[in-house]
């Protein structure tokens, strides 16, 4: 059962992970020698965690915890992190990735 105490612990883990760019597993297809590969540049919204898919899950977890526990003491940190990561520019860059060659590979739409 998810308690407020467990929710706070999960929030702290997710907050640490979404900011951690390395170590990183890269799952994209590089189609040119000068193709961008750095996590923060390639995926400005979802650069943290071990891989892109995990970063998406961590962001989902943070949003879900806010909904389930609106009084969570980590609320301000979660909101600041989501606001910093999920900007219109960052989301547009993520969308552009999916339109590029190789952008619809494993675990991506």
Residue ranges of predicted features:
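Alpha-solenoid helical-repeat scaffolds
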Residues: 1-4, 8, 48-56, 72, ...
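Low-complexity, Ser/Thr/Pro/Gly-enriched N-terminal "stalk/linker" regions
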Residues: 1-47
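Extended ligand-binding groove/face enriched in aromatic
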Residues: 40-44, 56, 65-109
